[in-house]
Every structure is written in C-alpha cells, then in structure tokens.
Amino acid sequence: MAAGSTGERPFFEIVTSIRYWVIHAVTLPSIFLAGYLFVSTGLAYDTFGTPRPDAYFQASESKAPVVSQRYEAKSQLDLRLQ
C-alpha cells in the first residue's frame, strides 16, 4: 500500500468492473421504477398527506380563496370547506 493511501479501490477501477455493472444494471432501474410507481399511483399523496391536484379547489371555485381577516382565517376556511 502506498503512503497516504486509505486502502480503498480507485473509483475508475470500480466503475470499469463487471461486478459493479451486474449489480447496478438491476438496482438503478429498479429505484427509478419504484419512484415512478410511487408517484404515478398516488401513493405519495396518501403517504405524505398532501392533497391531490384536483382537490385544491372545490368544483365551484375558479381561484384560490382569499382570507380577508387575519385572525379569523381558520373560521373563514372552515366555512369554505363545509
């Protein structure tokens, strides 16, 4: 081992090895596929509790509600959601 070496394999040696690509040829596409399915099925909305894009506004509304009284905001929004 050379002086100052940490004993780790050089990055170039890892990336050019067959073993690296055999492992990563399966794992990398799997990660992207899992992420795509997590978002496209709507499970991400359910997991993090965020509203779905069609649930931000009620059908009768065309824009975001405006709160007119700062300290009455909760009651104004509660009235809107009923």
Swiss-Prot record:
The chain crosses the membrane at residues 22-36. Keywords: Electron transport, Heme, Iron, Membrane, Metal-binding, Photosynthesis, Photosystem II, Thylakoid, Transmembrane, Transmembrane helix, Transport. It is a single-pass membrane protein. GO terms for molecular function: electron transfer activity; heme binding; iron ion binding. One of its GO terms (biological process) is photosynthetic electron transport chain. Disulfide bonds: none annotated. Its cofactor is heme b. Heme binds at residue 24. With its partner (PsbF) binds heme. PSII binds additional chlorophylls, carotenoids and specific lipids. One of its GO terms (cellular component) is photosystem II. The keyword NAD does not apply. It comes from the Bacteria. It is found in: Cellular thylakoid membrane. This b-type cytochrome is tightly associated with the reaction center of photosystem II (PSII). PSII is a light-driven water:plastoquinone oxidoreductase that uses light energy to abstract electrons from H(2)O, generating O(2) and a proton gradient subsequently used for ATP formation. It consists of a core antenna complex that captures photons, and an electron transfer chain that converts photonic excitation into a charge separation. Belongs to the PsbE/PsbF family. Heterodimer of an alpha subunit and a beta subunit. PSII is composed of 1 copy each of membrane proteins PsbA, PsbB, PsbC, PsbD, PsbE, PsbF, PsbH, PsbI, PsbJ, PsbK, PsbL, PsbM, PsbT, PsbX, PsbY, Psb30/Ycf12, peripheral proteins PsbO, CyanoQ (PsbQ), PsbU, PsbV and a large number of cofactors. It forms dimeric complexes. This is Cytochrome b559 subunit alpha. It comes from Prochlorococcus marinus (strain MIT 9313).
